[in-house]
């Protein structure tokens, strides 16, 4: 006999991880999928836009909270909020363009040109009390900082920037600000605060990065002497290209133009107590006044270098064929946001005025002033488009932006009331409680709390493209050549004549 061994089967779970597919999300549809473009184009342009002010700070007279001289600097963002007419209320040459019961009209931006006036110039910014200890580029033997105040009068020519961002919502900026410390480890007085990256819309008048970083200098530099005057109490923002490029709908940035340039001109170190001591393993201990070592907090002053007309982004047309996001130039809300920075026209004009008539030169009797001026002009070419009011399209637009349907006078039906409501017959009777008429709620502007330069183009649309510089350039792109009319009208016959009419020849 042979022994028979029976082995029990034991089930063991698989050690291989199983990855489940992610939960399906709603797909973002590009505007070209539901927007139908027509062959109707319009030109719209602004007037000459001027700004004059002090380049470093705003000025208010004593005892007056009103700003008498605003701050106008080339290192500020210029954010133009361009308002367009409602195409559904627009007087169209052809009334058969669309069916108002089944379609709605929108504008599409297909071309623009940002005009800049004033000559090229290099602007200088600085601080009369700049935190500078040693010239670490060409320094003699550096010793300990023994003076209580070693600040110096330093000026720089900041970073050179040309920037243009186009979209139908404000551009998004980023900067570093003071964060919130944990309650378990609160910082002591004089400790380095925690940092936090903050995103916020770029507003008109916000400061651009000039070479000292994108940060909130008012809260992170309490000495007020680490940067030039124009940003020492301001926040420098840098466009968050990553966030705007990843925007699902692509409204904040259809496309952008950018050119930045700088190099380090001088190298200094900061005066003051070192908050984080230099590790002893990184150096050999010195003698006399070289122990401990001098300040190791270094800073470089930027320089934007030469400005030239060969590297200009402005005063030339740009045509939008394909946007970087899903919004291919559709102006939702009948508005366009143009964010501009141009530091190549940065001349700060110095103005002098004498307090009395001078026979000999005396600087104490001459007052010096500084002003900065800016000049802009905006031109656009818009294309008329229409959207079919299908159920799928309206549901998608309501998910994207619920205010669009309200602007088109399309409302969603409210749910049916489940409770019994009271309705009086005689509403104005004195026998019942007062029935106050509730006025309709005014439509609030969600961007009213932000500051923009409003440009109203509602009365500037024209279908005669050949009458405007940008319109003629656009027609050249399409290969359309307009010929001037050379036909002359015939002179009308005089109503009365003093000459004797000639006798008609009789036909024989």
From Swiss-Prot:
Keyword set, alphabetical order: Capsid protein, Disulfide bond, Host nucleus, Host-virus interaction, Late protein, T=7 icosahedral capsid protein, Viral attachment to host cell, Viral penetration into host cytoplasm, Virion, Virus endocytosis by host, Virus entry into host cell
Comp. bias (Low complexity): 481-502
Chain intervals for the UniProt region annotation (Disordered): 481-508
HAMAP family (alphabetical): PPV_L1
Organism: Human papillomavirus 30
Function as written in the Swiss-Prot or TrEMBL entry: Forms an icosahedral capsid with a T=7 symmetry and a 50 nm diameter. The capsid is composed of 72 pentamers linked to each other by disulfide bonds and associated with L2 proteins. Binds to heparan sulfate proteoglycans on cell surface of basal layer keratinocytes to provide initial virion attachment. This binding mediates a conformational change in the virus capsid that facilitates efficient infection. The virion enters the host cell via endocytosis. During virus trafficking, L1 protein dissociates from the viral DNA and the genomic DNA is released to the host nucleus.
Chief location category: virion
Annotated gene: L1
Similarity annotation: Belongs to the papillomaviridae L1 protein family.
Protein's name according to its UniProt entry: Major capsid protein L1
Subunit structure: Self-assembles into homopentamers. The capsid has an icosahedral symmetry and consists of 72 capsomers, with each capsomer being a pentamer of L1. Interacts with the minor capsid protein L2; this interaction is necessary for viral genome encapsidation. Interacts with protein E2; this interaction enhances E2-dependent replication and transcription activation.
Source taxon at top rank: Viruses
Any one Gene Ontology BP term: endocytosis involved in viral entry into host cell
Molecular function as annotated in GO: structural molecule activity
InterPro entries xref list: Capsid_L1_Papillomavir (IPR002210), Capsid_L1_sf_Papillomavir (IPR036973), dsDNA_vir_gr_I_capsid (IPR011222)
Protein localization: Virion; Host nucleus
GO CC annotations, alphabetized: host cell nucleus; T=7 icosahedral viral capsid
């Amino acid at each position: 006999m042979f022994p028979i061994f029976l082995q029990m089967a034991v089930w063991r779970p698989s050690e291989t991880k199983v990855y489940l597919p992610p939960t399906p999300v709603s797909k973002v549809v590009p505007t070209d999928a539901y927007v139908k473009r027509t062959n109707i184009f319009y030109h719209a342009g602004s007037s000459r836009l001027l700004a004059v002010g002090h380049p470093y700070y705003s000025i208010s007279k004593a005892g007056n909270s009103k700003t008498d001289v605003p701050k106008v600097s080339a290192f500020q963002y210029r954010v133009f909020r361009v308002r367009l007419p409602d195409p559904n209320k627009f007087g169209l040459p052809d009334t058969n363009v669309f069916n108002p019961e089944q379609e709605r009209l929108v504008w599409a931006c297909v071309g623009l040109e940002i005009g800049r006036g004033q000559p090229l110039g290099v602007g200088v910014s600085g601080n009369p009390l700049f935190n500078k200890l040693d010239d670490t580029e060409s320094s003699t033997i550096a010793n300990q900082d023994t003076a209580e105040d070693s600040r110096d009068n330093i000026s720089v020519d900041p970073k050179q920037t040309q920037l243009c961002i186009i979209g139908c919502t404000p551009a998004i900026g980023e900067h570093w600000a003071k964060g919130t410390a944990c309650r378990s480890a609160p910082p002591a007085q004089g400790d380095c605060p925690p940092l936090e990256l903050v995103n916020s819309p770029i507003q008109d008048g916000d400061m651009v990065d000039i070479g000292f970083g994108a940060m909130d200098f008012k809260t992170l530099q309490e000495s007020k002497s680490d940067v030039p005057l124009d940003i020492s109490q301001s926040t420098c923002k840098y466009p968050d290209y990553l966030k705007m490029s990843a925007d699902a709908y692509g409204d904040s940035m259809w496309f952008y133009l950018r050119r930045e340039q700088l190099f380090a001109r001088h190298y200094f170190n900061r005066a003051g107590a070192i908050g984080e001591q230099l590790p002893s393993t990184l150096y050999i201990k010195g003698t006399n006044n070289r122990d401990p070592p001098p300040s190791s907090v270094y800073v470089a002053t930027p320089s934007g270098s030469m400005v030239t007309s060969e590297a200009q982004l402005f005063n030339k047309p740009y045509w939008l064929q394909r946007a970087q996001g899903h919004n291919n130039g559709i102006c939702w809300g009948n508005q366009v946001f143009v964010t501009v920075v141009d530091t190549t026209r940065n001349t700060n004009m110095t103005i002098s005025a004498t307090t009395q008539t001078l026979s000999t030169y005396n600087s104490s009797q001459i007052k010096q002033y500084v002003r900065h001026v800016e000049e802009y002009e905006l031109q656009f070419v818009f294309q008329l488009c229409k959207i079919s009011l299908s159920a799928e399209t309206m549901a998608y637009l309501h998910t994207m932006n619920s205010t669009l349907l309200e602007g088109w006078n399309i409302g969603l039906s409210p749910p049916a009331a489940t409770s019994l409501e009271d309705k009086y017959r005689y509403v104005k009777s004195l026998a019942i409680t007062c029935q106050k008429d509730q006025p309709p709620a005014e439509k609030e502007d969600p961007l009213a709390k932000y500051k923009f330069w409003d440009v109203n183009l509602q009365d500037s649309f024209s279908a005669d493209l050949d009458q405007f510089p940008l319109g003629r350039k656009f027609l050249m792109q399409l290969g359309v050549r307009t010929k001037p009319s050379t036909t002359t009208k015939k002179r009308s016959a005089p109503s009365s004549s003093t000459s004797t009419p000639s006798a008609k020849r009789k036909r024989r």
